[in-house]
Amino acid sequence: MEPAERAGVGEPPEPGGRPEPGPRGFVPQKEIVYNKLLPYAERLDAESDLQLAQIKCNLGRAVQLQELWPGGLFWTRKLSTYIRLYGRKFSKEDHVLFIKLLYELVSIPKLEISMMQGFARLLINLLKKKELLSRADLELPWRPLYDMVERILYSKTEHLGLNWFPNSVENILKTLVKSCRPYFPADATAEMLEEWRPLMCPFDVTMQKAITYFEIFLPTSLPPELHHKGFKLWFDELIGLWVSVQNLPQWEGQLVNLFARLATDNIGYIDWDPYVPKIFTRILRSLNLPVGSSQVLVPRFLTNAYDIGHAVIWITAMMGGPSKLVQKHLAGLFNSITSFYHPSNNGRWLNKLMKLLQRLPNSVVRRLHRERYKKPSWLTPVPDSHKLTDQDVTDFVQCIIQPVLLAMFSKTGSLEAAQALQNLALMRPELVIPPVLERTYPALETLTEPHQLTATLSCVIGVARSLVSGGRWFPEGPTHMLPLLMRALPGVDPNDFSKCMITFQFIATFSTLVPLVDCSSVLQERNDLTEVERELCSATAEFEDFVLQFMDRCFGLIESSTLEQTREETETEKMTHLESLVELGLSSTFSTILTQCSKEIFMVALQKVFNFSTSHIFETRVAGRMVADMCRAAVKCCPEESLKLFVPHCCSVITQLTMNDDVLNDEELDKELLWNLQLLSEITRVDGRKLLLYREQLVKILQRTLHLTCKQGYTLSCNLLHHLLRSTTLIYPTEYCSVPGGFDKPPSEYFPIKDWGKPGDLWNLGIQWHVPSSEEVSFAFYLLDSFLQPELVKLQHCGDGKLEMSRDDILQSLTIVHNCLIGSGNLLPPLKGEPVTNLVPSMVSLEETKLYTGLEYDLSRENHREVIATVIRKLLNHILDNSEDDTKSLFLIIKIIGDLLQFQGSHKHEFDSRWKSFNLVKKSMENRLHGKKQHIRALLIDRVMLQHELRTLTVEGCEYKKIHQDMIRDLLRLSTSSYSQVRNKAQQTFFAALGAYNFCCRDIIPLVLEFLRPDRQGVTQQQFKGALYCLLGNHSGVCLANLHDWDCIVQTWPAIVSSGLSQAMSLEKPSIVRLFDDLAEKIHRQYETIGLDFTIPKSCVEIAELLQQSKNPSINQILLSPEKIKEGIKRQQEKNADALRNYENLVDTLLDGVEQRNLPWKFEHIGIGLLSLLLRDDRVLPLRAIRFFVENLNHDAIVVRKMAISAVAGILKQLKRTHKKLTINPCEISGCPKPTQIIAGDRPDNHWLHYDSKTIPRTKKEWESSCFVEKTHWGYYTWPKNMVVYAGVEEQPKLGRSREDMTEAEQIIFDHFSDPKFVEQLITFLSLEDRKGKDKFNPRRFCLFKGIFRNFDDAFLPVLKPHLEHLVADSHESTQRCVAEIIAGLIRGSKHWTFEKVEKLWELLCPLLRTALSNITVETYNDWGACIATSCESRDPRKLHWLFELLLESPLSGEGGSFVDACRLYVLQGGLAQQEWRVPELLHRLLKYLEPKLTQVYKNVRERIGSVLTYIFMIDVSLPNTTPTISPHVPEFTARILEKLKPLMDVDEEIQNHVMEENGIGEEDERTQGIKLLKTILKWLMASAGRSFSTAVTEQLQLLPLFFKIAPVENDNSYDELKRDAKLCLSLMSQGLLYPHQVPLVLQVLKQTARSSSWHARYTVLTYLQTMVFYNLFIFLNNEDAVKDIRWLVISLLEDEQLEVREMAATTLSGLLQCNFLTMDSPMQIHFEQLCKTKLPKKRKRDPGSVGDTIPSAELVKRHAGVLGLGACVLSSPYDVPTWMPQLLMNLSAHLNDPQPIEMTVKKTLSNFRRTHHDNWQEHKQQFTDDQLLVLTDLLVSPCYYA
């Protein structure tokens, strides 16, 4: 790839590197380069300087005056726009000041969330290009961000509905942290570790939180001299943790993301080699591929896989370096998964595999770019020793190319493969392009497989640039271009849409890259050409032929679409969607081809298209559009030559056909006339200067045709007018050639072949701009005067009522007006007028700056825009008053109003779609390797044009003027008019206008709400609906009902509620009901808590002052006076007071609304819903609302009750009194010194946290002297720097208060809950069933009760007690659930009660719980489990000793049957699991209790015991730096179990399950006991397979031989439980992740079992092995002995006496060969061939009926083993034919006549070979000699094959 070897591409050639500060006094950080190429570039500096100065000054003042809104937001928005227009065009000093100011703003603690997001987005944008600011320039603290994340993402009040955050907030916050991370101070890492390490308790949710924090916060881009303060502090600790976790917990994936980032930022500074096998094994496991013969996936693995994107980044960063270990493993990874890419495979795992393929090359290219081409910046460069060498790149491309080529034809489409190939071809075109072409040529020939064509073409498009530019690695590339183009032509096929589109894209791509110039003459003139150049020269003679053939194809396409004449008659104006796509493809491809043609070829093409278009007459809808497009393309390329042909022709035809005046009034016009009008209107879309020659002719045509009666006719004529105006007044590039200056030079001076695939040069782009000349402008005004003026006069009179016009005439006039307006949009100055004042008071200027877009407005002429506005408004009122049903005119008026307001030469939606398509084309052809904007010239020109359009869209600013106000009001009137289509169109324009002007929504809301007022008479249903739609808004724009502003929602929300009383409201109409539903849903979805406090802290103000003082550029505005600043502060305090007043006011008005008599229930519910949004965490709800919600706990409607429950729970949280905390020193309590290094787990210094029945506090004194720690994770990993616990009872808020001691709000709640009637009613409602069988324990209700008991301690127990006793006794599902929710609330609410109160509480609860647990049923056990688990969550176990002792009394009493026992265990498990590591004593007691009961007969109890065991041993983890736990250990337990299972181990025959479920009492023998025990143990192993962190393999291995014996071989579900479980258990165990030191142990067991006398065991060893090896592939490959052992094991089992075992060994062997674990080497081949040659004993005639025949002879077994081995080798490469295969097949075929089972094996092998190789047989045939082919064909079709 030569171009990049030129130094410093992409920098203007300037001496001395960094540009000097110019006269402007500052060096911009990074401008948008495209601005320099605009035709008016020289005016931009002054413009941007002025804007920047205004932004700095006003943003600074706004902050200093404490005015966040509107001033602050207005000017930060202006700064965002500034960056979009000019890039980062400010000095480094200003850049830093902007960042610091926004950082301070974003981290204001009480900032309203929507403002926070606005500031955050801008800050992210300012920090985006991190190379612009080094760590020396900027330092940002990390704590404010942490406080924000903690407050928002881990909000304590959000779940109670006291805070409403938008969904986007999580991503914005994470991106913000990511952007600030490079600038955290050097000591940040240590501080973060100190802060979050204490959260690392692997059994607790806080672990997830800690790792999330590490992942998003830890800085990894520190310079090498600071590494000791960076990752070296945590790397060993976290990688150790990752390596030792065996089952994927959720946080493991986040660790991977962190390591990936660390690796990328520090290539060459970390030695990953020791971890590589583990990393690759885990990545392979995480793909969840189906392997092996009996597959059951661990359910855990499916959900928590790694994010492929991060895994790829990690792999890429580790590549290279001296050891090459990663490349070796990567090759191994692809070897083992390549066959999954074959198109015949499909499954849910395929997406991941495709993503891997697509991301890897992309990532490697990015790394190469960084190492070789990127401009060096302050970020640490990659050391030379670790840069990727050319060899590394070659190795990489070679290892990935096979799967990519397979993926080309994948079921999911070829997109990923094409993207991968694009990047691979940048690196190694010579390895990548030839195989792609090999697949492309046949695909272009095939007729039967069109999908192959689309797939290969899209891949060739990806590699097009690499192919065409050739370069020294792949010089022959360009020679393929012409053959490909010629062969692609048949793809232009009217019958196959997708083929047609991809062909267009293909041809367009290649034409853009190559000048289509015939250079064959150069061969005679020059003799210094290379071989390839000569070849290309002679080939280019075909270009002309290609262009002409392409045109013929297109004409064919067009003619076939004309056949659908029937559509002509119908009124469908539109083409179908597919037709319009084909039209687009055709026109853009044709225009690309002509742009790239030499003059000679162009002239031939022009003549051809002219002849075609003038010799036919086309219908104007489909075919006509396509032909006209082709003609337009031709005219655009060479206007002079083309206009000469077309204009006179069309004009003369049109003049002739309109000679007769009758034509003017015809309803239906002659086809020829229409076609010529269409053609003329399209070919005038060219360079305006060239049109001036023909102006007289064109004006004549307009005069003749603009007033045709036929709508189709005058519409085409209007198009002509529109295009003439646009062509003469707009600014646009006139050519998009791939080389500046075109190809029209003699071959002696210019050799086009040098320009094949050449990128455009940004610094010499040579854009030819069309800038309107004065002549063109005056022509445009002449057109407006001649054609627009008369229409306006007519319409003016019509609006005044002086002139009667028919509807058709009005429509015609409006059409002319609209076309004039959009034709001259950028000629007409924007609307002038008075601004609308007093909408929003502000102390800073909110002025807009006008942008210059290349034209000075001519203000001496009258402004047509204003005249149109006046006339149209008058006409509109006339039509609405007199003929509202003239909808067609109204549609046009709506369009005109929209364009008057917003159209300045380009439409926003067109701009957006062009920006999108620009990005798509850029992606499909970009060169990510060299970067530096090396795009092709046409793309660069397009990008400059987009920059110009962006400016025209922002030219106006957003000032809201009187004239805008009038027009928006007109739109509102139209939006509430009688016809739904008119309303719909008007509403869309209305929403667009609302989004365009500052603060206009506040002006318009009252007008919309007028239609909803209940007291207003005469509102029609249409107006009512229209107004509701106006409130609702569309999916993208503003929603008036929910502006985040008190002033607005104070009006809209109450209006929505009381509109229920309007007489226009009817709940019978489903459309209205749905509208209200949508409104309520949208408000709930979009509402974010609105701020009450807008104070700005001092730190912000200080930076704001600096910003105002910043020079270069600055406007010399004096600093603010102290009086002004005082006034600002005063206003700000008033604003806070206003906000509060508005808030209370809104609550009041809503309550008034909801409490109105005869308000329909729907509106009552909406009102209550809105009220519940107004709960906040910084302000208690007003008393009236509290009373309202409490009373509604007993409302009749369940919807209301549910809302009230949530609300009251929130209110109780607001009323919660704060509990005092104090700091303790844990080491003093334990009396142990602080551990010096990090040791997690049970240590002497955290022992005091454990539950210890000897020291639990049983008296008041003990209780009050204990130090309780409620949260479970403290102290496990390490102690926090500042450990706080709750202070003693006497310092806490007073309990047992009388009513007088309470606040008013509390009294309201107190009164209701002390009232027995109220409580009785409440309990009745709560114990009703909601949805049968669907109800669950409800956390909302639990929160309600927890709040009640926390805030009022035991005040309500007396009233509740009888209810609780009565509920517990009732065994109904809903009553049990109700009591469970209350009890959980009681236990958690009693956290701060005094000892006496708690003791009394447990006296009440214990009997209740005992009753409940003995009445437990299948419907309620889940609820009781949830109740106990919730009760124990985050509570100190020593405070709950009553509960634990109660639960442990006797879980398995047998009373109430096995089911109750199982449920009690479930409940107990819930409680203990919440306590994690702090109750070792209880776990030991439980284990001791359960061990004798492991032989339980009942299945449900066994399952439950298995699950409980998992939790008992959960704490026994082998994580690094963790002490052995005091809780029970697995090894000791397993040893005791093995002892009891001995009797089963020693027996050789099959173990039958002869234990009946309900067996007698008699004494059982050891085996029966053993089998029962085994069943429970299996349940335990299955339960822990996915849950525990690490598997204690060593001990469990000893159980394997037993399972091997039991597991059944056939897949049959009728087996008993024991066998099924054994099989499942083996499958789960085989997928487990092994540590390297466990490998020999496992193999030991497998080898031992392979000698077992049970063939079931030997068979199962093989299925186990398949999965185990694949799931631990690189761990095994890393251990040579292990590989030898496995090889020996499989090969020896091939000679097993049992046929099934032999066959399974063959399958296993073939699998191991296929994933490249073993290789087919000569010793193996020789071994099998020897075995095949084993002589078979002669057949003896035997007596009929003798037995001897059934046992196979040893010789037969050996011979069969050999044949199986060879068969395995054949089947191990299902998709290709390696060199050794033909001979093997011949050897196999020799055994076709051997005795069974050999013959069968050979047949099976051959039939499989045939099946897998059938698809690409043409390709595979090449590998065989002719003789071999004869034999093979014989075999594969011979009759014996079918026998």
Curated annotation (Swiss-Prot):
**Keywords associated with the record:** Cytoplasm, Developmental protein, Differentiation, DNA damage, DNA repair, Nucleus, Phosphoprotein, Proteasome, Repeat, Spermatogenesis
Domain of life, per lineage: Eukaryota
Q: Which segments show compositional bias classed as Low complexity?
A: 1-11
One GO term under biological process is: proteasomal ubiquitin-independent protein catabolic process
List, alphabetically, the InterPro entries matched.
ARM-like, ARM-type_fold, Blm10_mid, HEAT_PSME4, PSME4, PSME4_C
Tell me, in a sentence or two, what this protein's role is. Associated component of the proteasome that specifically recognizes acetylated histones and promotes ATP- and ubiquitin-independent degradation of core histones during spermatogenesis and DNA damage response. Recognizes and binds acetylated histones via its bromodomain-like (BRDL) region and activates the proteasome by opening the gated channel for substrate entry. Binds to the core proteasome via its C-terminus, which occupies the same binding sites as the proteasomal ATPases, opening the closed structure of the proteasome via an active gating mechanism.
Q: Give an example GO molecular function.
A: peptidase activator activity
Q: Which residues are annotated with the PTM Phosphoserine?
A: 1121, 1614, 1746
Show the segment(s) annotated as Bromodomain-like (BRDL). Answer: 1650-1738
Tell me, how does this one assemble? Answer: Homodimer. Interacts with the 20S and 26S proteasomes. Component of the spermatoproteasome, a form of the proteasome specifically found in testis.
**Family per UniProt?**
Belongs to the BLM10 family.
At which residues are the HEAT repeats?
475-519, 998-1037, 1179-1217, 1354-1392, 1636-1674, 1680-1718
UniProt-annotated location(s): Cytoplasm, Cytosol; Nucleus; Nucleus speckle
Where do the segments described as Disordered lie? 1-25
| Any Pfam family | HEAT_PSME4
| Domain comment as written in the entry | The bromodomain-like (BRDL) region specifically recognizes and binds acetylated histones.
The beginning of the lineage is: Eukaryota, Metazoa, Chordata, Craniata, Vertebrata
Q: What is this protein identified as?
A: Proteasome activator complex subunit 4
